Amino acid sequence: MVFISLKGTSIYEICFFFVICAIKNLKSHLMSFLKDKILYEGLTFDDVLLVPAYSEVLPREVDLSSMFTRNIRINTPVVSAAMDSVTEDELAIAISREGGIGVIHKNMSIEKQASQVKRVKRAENVMIFDPITINLEATVAEAMNLMSEYKIGGIPVIDNNGILKGIVTNRDLRFENNPSRKITEVMTTNLITTNHQTNLESAARILQKHKIEKLPMIDESGKLIGLITYKDITKTKDRPNSCKDDKGRLRVAGAVGIAADTMERVEALINANVDAISIDTSHAHTKSVINILKEIKRNYPKVEVVAGNIVTSEAAKKLVDEGADAVKVGIGPGSICTTRIIAGVGIPQLSAIYNVAKAIEGSGVPVIADGGIRYSGDIIKAIAAGADSIMAGSLFAGVEESPGDTIIYNGRKFKAYRGMGSIEAMQQGSKDRYFQDIEDDIKKLVPEGIEARVPYKGTLAEVIYQMTGGLRAGMGYLGAKNITILKKEGKFVRITHSGIIESHPHDVSITREAPNYSRKSFE
């Protein structure tokens, strides 16, 4: 017991003494509480910098190829998000041509999503083994509609037995004013053909010799078995970095949820030759998501399945044990996501990536870092923390190929961008992503995202060039010649808030924006 002499002490001093004692006692209890409850300190991209190392690697020499899933390699470690203002067929085609892969969102009918996957798969083919065809009874209007739907310039004409009878191209229809005219009256019948043994070089020589753009492949009976086009040969030579399957088709993934029609959607996407299925939810460490994952793998054991999103080591191990071919990391880091504020959950993205990557190290299951990427420097930080690729939404929402509406605001061009947890997106089909699919009353939806606008950025190719340029530069500083070495050797130093300020341009007024930097992203 402590005895205190109060002689000569005012009542105010006595009260102050007891208040101080109470505060110290409360602080002691709080520290005990925090010790029990706080697991660790979470870090994100702005909290760290990578430490440069001795290097013999030039940026132009690095290899950016990485794994998207267990069995799908991408040549650029960049994935476009499954968002209805980001990835549809046009952007999926563009990003695959740049070496990455797009995940077509599911806020559309099953038929429309499958059709978009088909468009991507048909956008480029070294040899098209299932070309779009038209029969002898078709009209000019039907041919035009097919060309418009699939964005193609020519269609082989076959009879009921599949025998090639001719070909109709956009040149044949360019000045045709009678849409009901039979296709047999306008098609070309004197055709140059080849067989399935023709290689790419031989096909190119035949096309050049006869000055034609399309070379049908037929079997011994005259049945159409494929098509080679000059345009696809040219694209193959012009874009050697494109992400393609073993048949020379661009790769694409499709998103599914946990709704009642999920397996129907999965079947349609697989029939459309999708390369991977992405189970798209806000929290994948749940019974419902795991059950869907198991059902997909049970019915389609060869299909590659991405499962997400998660942020903990326990979740990662569980999904890998249940058959996931890739895991997607991120709860709440996105620019249009409010999950951390509304639900109060999440882990800062850098720590989340490290948690997951460390937990499944050696499993052969790649990690996709989804969200929080604002600068190209964040990409290299994400990979050094353990990710195999990054997924982005806001970085691509402003490109020409994104499906978002174009907006003119204060004389500048913007594009609409919204979170899949926004009210509007949830109304159109993403409710199950946030486990609210049984709720029909809009007033009872609890959104976890917002609607926004982002500056128009030009073409996706221009954005990817700057993103990968920054990644290459960073790998050069670290002496990492490929992604594997970057993941293994990358080391961080933690920085203070003053260090963050010092890292950005300071003490000047920016007079001209750089194509890869915006102060607004920092603020």
Model-derived features with residue positions:
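Alpha/beta catalytic cores of nucleotide-metabolism and tRNA/nucleoside-modifying enzymes
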Residues: L30-Y54, N135, N195, A255, ...
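Bateman/CBS regulatory modules and CBS-like beta-alpha motifs in cytosolic regions of diverse proteins
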Residues: R60-I74, A81-M83, K112-Y150, V157-D159, ...
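Catalytic cores of alpha/beta
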Residues: L91-A92, E264-R265, L269, T312-D325, ...
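Glycine-rich phosphate-binding active-site loops on the catalytic face of alpha/beta enzymes
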Residues: G102-S109, I277, T281-H285, V329-A343, ...
